[in-house]
Amino acid sequence: MKTYLQVIISAVFFISANQIGCDSLSDLTKSGELVVSTVNNPHTHYSDHSGSKGFEYDLAKRFAHVLDLELRVIPAKNSTEALQLLDNGEADIAALGEKISSAPNFFQLETQPHTIANLAVVYMAGNSRPRKVSDLETLRISADIQSWSTDLIKSFVGIDFISSIPNASTKVLLDSIQTRAADVAIVNGIEFRLLQKLYPQLKLAFVIEETQIPIGWYVNNTSSGIVLKKLADHFIDTASKNGVTDSLRSKSFVSLSDFSNGDAFTFDKRIQERLPLYKDSINQVAEEFDLEWELLAAISYQESHWNPWATSPTGVRGMMMLTQRTAAELGVLERTDLYQSLRGGAEYFLDLHRRLPDDIFEPHRTSLALAAYNVGMGHLEDARVLTEKMGGDPHNWMDVSNYLPYLQIKKYYEPTKHGYARGAEAVTYVKNIQNYYQTLIWHKLVSKDSTQTSPDFQVALLPNSITGKHWSAL
């Protein structure tokens, strides 16, 4: 069923479409699907246990819904390949999340922008922070030669030479700083904001306010492509005016918003130093139980920080910090045995996951099962009953998480079946695992770019003509 906002968008959209003569969509709708080529990254499109996500994916899905089409996404290795899929007629739209300097060409059209981005200058924490363009004069700078960034840097900043990597992702450019191959990188500010938690040692120096980069979609310069562009233009305009694009964009930034830099730094260090010792074991057990290894890794990190010999003051032990009672029920003889602990924890989590009512769906089902792993199924059910009494949805994790802490307040826990529980700790527990899981998923996405090599960086030359440029130091 469409929401009120979707009905309004659809109505305005089709009125506008008729006004521009787009009442016949036979060429676009005969297949019953809208095919979008894109690249996998946290901003555009990626998948986890609850399905596909990403701003570009969410926006394209809304567009397909308005057209009454099914959305089919074709992930490409990079932007060049995504545009090639468009050129070959294998895709209707290329949604890249960036502006390519070589596009659109004669064969491609660009829709009106759904996003205005800025370039961000990024540096390594501990180094001297550049605050204005003249501070870059003697620094080694990396950028993507085929992106809009190089053209704009030369246009707005006046850099005569810049070290660049063809088809370089934001991840590759950020890696060039971490490996000390470059002093600063000039990247898409939106993507850096999303990836910053994966790079806790990198900081934003300043943004280049002059670089108002319009980012839209690409379509083919054909009769059907021209129609699709007009439809997309009206959709984007309507969605922007009704706040849909802002809402979807905000959704993209929620995932790691409460992940502190300190936690991110520690977790990144553990990923580099400790996870490699146990990743194969986690992978093996995850495959045995048909779990995502990232989810099992996130749970085990929250439980023990990937320490198979961990022991708490309350007596829980091992990689998955099983109680003696739970271990006995699961047939775990030695809780500090890595495989026994991982298998026991995976089995326990999946049992909780299965015991939830059938009409609870993802992503709420996994979040509720995680809460039960921490606080117990009985206390979780008490919280769900309380949530419903208070007017919330007991099937929705966000609603239940609001009322779990009430189990620490006497007037609320006394009438419950299982009594007092540390509900606030359970909420934090789930939130932490969500952060760790999301970080591991994003690490997997961006690590696919690691095969790209960095060039030999040289000093970028900044002419005196840059004096007077306006920069924003944050």
PLM features: residue spans?
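Periplasmic-binding protein-like
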Residues: 38-42, 112-126, 196-234, 259-263, ...
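Extended ligand-binding regions for polar small-molecule ligands
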Residues: 54-66, 125-149, 213-256, 276, ...
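Catalytic and substrate-binding regions of cell-wall glycan-acting enzymes that process beta-1,4-linked
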Residues: 219, 368-439
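Substrate-binding/active-site groove segments that recognize
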Residues: 140, 145, 309-333, 339-351, ...
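Short, functionally critical alpha-helical segments immediately adjacent to catalytic or ligand/cofactor-binding
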Residues: 291-307, 342-346, 369-375, 433
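Export/targeting segments at the very N-terminus of extracytoplasmic proteins
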Residues: 256-306, 339, 356-359, 445, ...
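A ligand-binding cleft/hinge motif common to bilobed small-molecule-binding domains
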Residues: 96-106, 155, 178-211, 381-382, ...
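Extracytoplasmic small-molecule ligand-binding "clamshell" domains
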Residues: 21-98, 102-105, 163-167
